[in-house]
């Protein structure tokens, strides 16, 4: 079994830091297309997959120093919030959600 490596507490050198997240990460993909694109609809279908991947990539590049990736986490939270608000609005208006 692999040992768990503690997160880094030293700042990542500027050359190794990931570029700041763009506003595009805060906008979810069309969830209807995302759901229909899969063979089976599951709870793991995520229209905010790009923001999720960017967050994980940031963690890997900074040796899991969470304080350097807060912008990416915020972008992911915004994306999820926008997606859930969009689904809620569609349900309230009687639109198809899947």
Curated annotation (Swiss-Prot):
<dbReference type="GO" id="GO:0033108">
    <property type="term" value="P:mitochondrial respiratory chain complex assembly"/>
</dbReference>
<dbReference type="GO" id="GO:0005739">
    <property type="term" value="C:mitochondrion"/>
</dbReference>
<feature type="domain" description="CHCH">
    <location>
        <begin position="45"/>
        <end position="87"/>
    </location>
</feature>
<feature type="short sequence motif" description="Cx9C motif 2">
    <location>
        <begin position="69"/>
        <end position="79"/>
    </location>
</feature>
<dbReference type="GO" id="GO:0005758">
    <property type="term" value="C:mitochondrial intermembrane space"/>
</dbReference>
<comment type="similarity">
    <text>Belongs to the COX23 family.</text>
</comment>
<comment type="function">
    <text>Required for the assembly of cytochrome c oxidase.</text>
</comment>
<dbReference type="InterPro" id="IPR009069">
    <property type="entry name" value="Cys_alpha_HP_mot_SF"/>
</dbReference>
<feature type="disulfide bond">
    <location>
        <begin position="48"/>
        <end position="79"/>
    </location>
</feature>
<keyword id="KW-1015">Disulfide bond</keyword>
<feature type="transit peptide" description="Mitochondrion">
    <location>
        <begin position="1"/>
        <end position="18"/>
    </location>
</feature>
<feature type="disulfide bond">
    <location>
        <begin position="58"/>
        <end position="69"/>
    </location>
</feature>
<feature type="compositionally biased region" description="Polar residues">
    <location>
        <begin position="1"/>
        <end position="13"/>
    </location>
</feature>
<feature type="region of interest" description="Disordered">
    <location>
        <begin position="1"/>
        <end position="27"/>
    </location>
</feature>
<keyword id="KW-0809">Transit peptide</keyword>
<dbReference type="InterPro" id="IPR051040">
    <property type="entry name" value="COX23"/>
</dbReference>
<protein>
    <recommendedName>
        <fullName>Cytochrome c oxidase-assembly factor COX23, mitochondrial</fullName>
    </recommendedName>
</protein>
<feature type="short sequence motif" description="Cx9C motif 1">
    <location>
        <begin position="48"/>
        <end position="58"/>
    </location>
</feature>
<keyword id="KW-0496">Mitochondrion</keyword>
């Amino acid at each position: 079994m692999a040992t768990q490596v503690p997160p880094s507490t030293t700042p990542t050198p500027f050359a190794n830091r990931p570029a700041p997240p763009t506003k595009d990460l805060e906008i979810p993909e069309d969830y209807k297309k995302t759901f229909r694109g899969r063979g089976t609809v599951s709870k793991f279908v995520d229209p905010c997959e790009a923001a999720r991947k960017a967050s994980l990539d940031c963690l890997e590049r900074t040796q899991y120093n969470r304080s350097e990736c807060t912008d990416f986490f915020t972008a992911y939270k915004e994306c999820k919030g926008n997606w859930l608000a969009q689904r809620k609005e569609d349900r309230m208006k009687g639109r198809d959600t899947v």
